[in-house]
Amino acid sequence: MRTVRYILTATFLFIAVCVEAQQLRKEAFALLNLEQPALEKVKAACARQHWDEAAQALLDYYRHRNGVVHPDLDLQNIKISKEEQKWADDALGHTFFVHKGYQPSYNYGKDINWEYWPVQDNELRWQLHRHKWFTPMGKAYRLSGDEKYAKEWAYQYIDWIEKNPLTEVEPEEYELVSAGEVKGDAENVRFAWRPLEVSNRLQDQTLQFLLFVNSPSFTPAFLTEFLVNYHRHALHILNNYSAQGNHLLFEAQRIVYAGAFFPEFKEAASWRESGINILNREIKKQVYTDGGHYELDPHYHLAAINIFCKALRMADVNGFRQEFPAGYVGTVKHMIEFYSNVCFPDYSNPCFSDAKLGNRSAEVGNYQDWLKIFPDCEWIRYYATEGREGSPLSYLSHGALDSGFFTFRNGWKQDATVMVVKAGPKGEWHCQPDNGTFELWFNGRNLFPDSGSYVYAGDDEVMKLRNWFRQTSVHNTLTLDEKNLQTTESVTRLWQPEGNEQILVTENPHYEDLKHRRSVFFVDQAYFVIVDEAVGNAR
């Protein structure tokens, strides 16, 4: 026991020394607009080149700052789950929660090896640099008052900066989806500094800032390190936005967060403007008129909703909602309605394409967040309160003909019968060759779950598993000799969502010389008849 205590004590002393040894970064002050009245003490100290005094004044300012509100954190009502507490505690010994698919979590060594890659899955390497355990460490610190969490967080934060310098790589190298093509320093940069991961840190470090700023370990010198690093992150996003898709949405929303949460930066207003302009543009490009997102994946549809809503919430609480047009807000609500229609009574969504199942508490939490934006919407209130308040959508069956999602439904409660069919156009990267597939919910159970997805990319072994989950033959649709679909462009021939015999007829040119026509009949809102026709001369 004495040996263990000695090791722990030595470890924390080592961490404390590392934190205290950080050099004050006086260039941080040049990044800020010191003309703001609240920063007059900082400005005066800088004018005298009293950098320690300036850093202390700046830290005092941030510890007492008013006027900036964070919609994702109430410091008076912090809650930590058992899972988050475990992440925080494990992180003290450098066992980092990185990916749910790889449990138990890996240990990255006493001298943290940020390049450790135990399984050649790109997501494992990318997601390490999202630092998912940092915010739980902050919650654990605020709730317990135990300085060990703050000391270790500050140590890991600086350690990451020192071991992951930003150097130039080709933009396309950030998005390579298999292992081993990029060598040397560039290999680590493409993982640590991929714009999506950078944006993730940009967002989450606003929370960590609030949780740790009052800690003795959050020193004036550390503050200058933090601000310089944060500014570097923001500029990297602005200069390396992804070309399209959900990555671009995440990056834009998070640059809005950066500009709103740190208005002291000279470029803060332009950061916010950049993000809002992209979101306003992309919501028109990425969302069909029926409210479906063009990935044609329920999980990424949900992610897009939350991206658009997070930006709105940040705007609401900080007084710039007017920068989003009414059409933007209306589209977000339409997307929520779409999502409500494709989900089952237990709040789970079909695992079409790369979708993940989700869990009830998180889904209810989504509706609760959405209700803050749409407080007068009775059907959002219904799902936010698990049916205790409000009223459900006024119809049952629903068709989204542009994106190709069709729901037969006889109720909204647990004992309902629900079928969701996916039969739409060619989707984006996360969409799978599964046109005509369906899931069926009956009396509290999903009787026909879709295959879902594996991890996204990695070495040959990882890709073998990835491709197994993607293949058409593991979906609930017709195949020829178990080959993947050659074409995914379904056409709706008939959609009749009312009456005692509700009908969907959809066609897709699955293969050369073979068209698949699937007709679904929902009879008396009680049972289904599915008729499959293979039309053509294919052999």
Language-model region placement:
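Short, solvent-exposed loop/edge-beta patches enriched in aromatic
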Residues: 51, 66-70, 80-92, 96-102, ...
